[in-house]
Amino acid sequence: MKFKSEKDVFVEALSAAGRVVGRTLGATQGILLALTGNQLTVTGTDLDITTRVTLDVIGFDDGAVLIPARLLVDAVRTLDAGAVTLETKGDKVDVSLGRTNYQLNTYSLVDFPKLPPVAAPTATLTALDFVEGLSQVVRATSSDEARPLLTGVLFTTEDEIGRAHV
């Protein structure tokens, strides 16, 4: 697998997936990178929550690799601005930009948990509508961790009407 991506876009995707990776099980401590054409899918999971981010890259060789999340995120963050190149070489991966090069070990792909396929989106919101709806209800949430049910926001949709309810 080999691709190029702008550092800032890549770091944003890695950070999103890296926030949910597991802390105890080996393979769930990794971020799965899967390249098909010019589409890179970045996946992180702790078996309860999964985050998938898809971004456009310049793809050279399709493939997939499972890399320790913390090492990958830290390595890419330290690079200067520009186009980051990631290339697999056996059980290692090279992350480079300019004269800086990191070589990281990888996990076996067979150890990564099989995730259910992502269903088609049930609703699409603009960022403005999402933020507006969220800002109307988030003040009603509790910060008391003793009652975790009240610390979140539930999103539902009504398909017939096409509105999202927060």
Regions found by a protein language model. Name each.
Residues M1-R163:
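Structural preference for solvent-exposed beta-strand-turn elements
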